């Protein structure tokens, strides 16, 4: 049968996938000449995004991937509010101030009942760390100027396990970064070594409450005690900043007796990520100071914008209000009891996953029981396969499990890491263990990539050696011929 009627040009009668918009390639790096229908734009983008990984199965990330529908609605209701318009959105500003005060008191800031805490909401812990670092640098510079001493070579002491934002701070704001190297079996900053590295130019020592490598808490109390002693001996006043990006919303609920916060006298500022275990979508972070004198007044800007004086201390200006509102929702919705329940569930699911991995008898666990709910583990035997192969094969099941090497002095250690978030259930933990076992079984039936690589390298080395032998032999032959030829020239015909 031959069709004699051509297809209609009326787009309104076509389904989305029958329209011309899915048959043509849109320009990727320049704006198109013509508009396209809204449903076409939506479908085209949605289809491309299907190739992204599933955020719920992204076990590499600490960032929250699930919130209650009521909070989702609040976020959408406030998505068009610019936070800097404080005079126009005074309630949003008030909610931020409430969050700052709740978090400061959660971290045991020495505040009177009616006293207002000093802190600010940020787009994440990276910005929070930049702000805290600037405050330390300015305080140190002011002190050195008053004493008539040089103030052009500030440094900061951290562990080699710090997040890259610390390196950014050091590079962007011209501060020397002095890192305490790690060692096998000890993957966090050693407080004794850190205290030894402190000198009169040290603006602060940064301790991590929840290393990104294995979730371990650094010993902030030990560091505080060592620095108190060193300050007394030297007359310095080296303070501590606690990077509690991951652990700040865990320790108060699970380890209330652990002294890491403003209970320690040298802890002057703390940052925490609301979008990690604060249980809010990216990106919201917080930084709070012990007292007003720990944040130099000259760093605070007073801006007359849209009719109101606005004190501000941020690295940007415009930003959304929705994440601040979402943080306030979680704080009042969950309360202490709710956060405690969530964190206990995370810890229990971490234990289930850890025990399941141990039962395979193929891995060493390098994470600690006390810390952020993370399971970091490495293969006992690397003769045939490695962690990167396991990470790659787990993606076939939908899991995103990162494999990486440790920092300086422990870089020969490779680990896999699973972050246990609120939405990682017991069922998923058991399923992941089963899928890891399947991957191990499959790897056992496959030829070793490592052996193959070594074999290829060995063959290449043999070829190289043979090539060198031939080259040497040819050089000898050419040299001998040249020698004989020269002899003939000198002696004539024999």
Swiss-Prot record:
EC class of the enzyme, as a word: lyase
Site (Anchoring site for calmodulin binding): 488-489
Regulation of this protein's activity per its record: Up-regulated by calmodulin binding at physiological pH.
pH-activity profile: Optimum pH is 6.0.
Free-text note on domains in this protein's UniProt record: The C-terminus (463-494) binds calmodulin in a calcium-dependent fashion.
Family: Belongs to the group II decarboxylase family.
Protein's UniProt name: Glutamate decarboxylase 2
Species of the source: Arabidopsis thaliana
Lineage: Eukaryota, Viridiplantae, Streptophyta, Embryophyta, Tracheophyta
């Amino acid at each position: 049968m031959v069709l004699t009627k051509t297809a209609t040009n009326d787009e309104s009668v076509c389904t989305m996938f029958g329209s011309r918009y899915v048959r043509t390639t849109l320009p990727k790096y320049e704006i198109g000449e013509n508009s396209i229908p809204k449903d076409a734009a939506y479908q085209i983008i949605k289809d491309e995004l299907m190739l992204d990984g599933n955020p719920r199965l992204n076990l590499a990330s600490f960032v929250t991937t699930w919130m209650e529908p009521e909070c989702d609605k609040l976020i959408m209701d406030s998505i068009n509010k610019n936070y800097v318009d404080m005079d126009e959105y005074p309630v949003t500003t008030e909610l931020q101030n409430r969050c700052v005060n709740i978090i400061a008191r959660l971290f045991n800031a020495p505040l009177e009942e009616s006293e207002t805490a000093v802190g600010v909401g940020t787009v994440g812990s990276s910005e929070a760390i930049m702000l805290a670092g600037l405050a330390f640098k300015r305080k140190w510079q002011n002190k050195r100027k008053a004493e008539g001493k040089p103030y052009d070579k500030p440094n900061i002491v951290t562990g080699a396990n710090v997040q890259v934002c610390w390196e950014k701070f050091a590079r962007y704001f011209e501060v020397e970064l002095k890192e305490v190297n790690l060692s096998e079996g000890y993957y966090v900053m050693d407080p004794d070594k850190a205290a030894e590295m402190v000198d009169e130019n040290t603006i602060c020592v940064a301790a991590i409450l929840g290393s990104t490598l294995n979730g371990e808490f650094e010993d902030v109390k030990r560091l505080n005690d060592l620095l108190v002693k060193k300050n007394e001996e030297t007359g310095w006043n080296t303070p501590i900043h606690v990077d509690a990006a991951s652990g700040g919303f865990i320790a108060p609920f699970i380890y209330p007796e652990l002294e890491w916060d403003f209970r320690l006298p040298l802890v002057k500022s703390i940052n925490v990520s609301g979008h990690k275990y604060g249980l809010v979508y990216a990106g919201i972070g917080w930084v709070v100071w012990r007292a007003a004198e720990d944040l130099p007044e000259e760093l605070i800007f007073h801006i007359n914008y849209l009719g109101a004086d606005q004190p501000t201390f941020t690295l940007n200006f415009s930003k959304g209000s929705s994440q601040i509102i979402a943080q306030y929702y979680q704080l009042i919705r969950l309360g202490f009891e709710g956060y405690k329940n969530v964190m206990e569930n995370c810890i229990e699911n971490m234990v289930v996953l850890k025990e399941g991995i141990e039962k395979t008898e193929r891995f060493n666990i390098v994470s600690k029981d006390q810390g952020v709910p993370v399971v970091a583990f490495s293969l006992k035997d690397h003769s045939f396969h490695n962690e990167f192969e396991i990470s790659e094969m787990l993606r076939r099941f939908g899991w995103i499990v990162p494999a990486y090497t440790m920092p300086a002095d422990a870089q020969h250690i490779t680990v896999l890491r699973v972050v246990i978030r609120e939405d990682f259930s017991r069922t998923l933990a058991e399923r992941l263990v089963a899928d890891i076992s399947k991957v191990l079984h499959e790897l056992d039936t496959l030829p070793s990539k490592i052996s193959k690589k070594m074999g290829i390298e060995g063959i290449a080395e043999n070829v190289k050696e043979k090539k060198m032998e031939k080259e040497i032999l040819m050089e000898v032959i050419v040299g001998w011929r040249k020698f004989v030829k020269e002899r003939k020239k000198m002696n004539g015909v024999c």
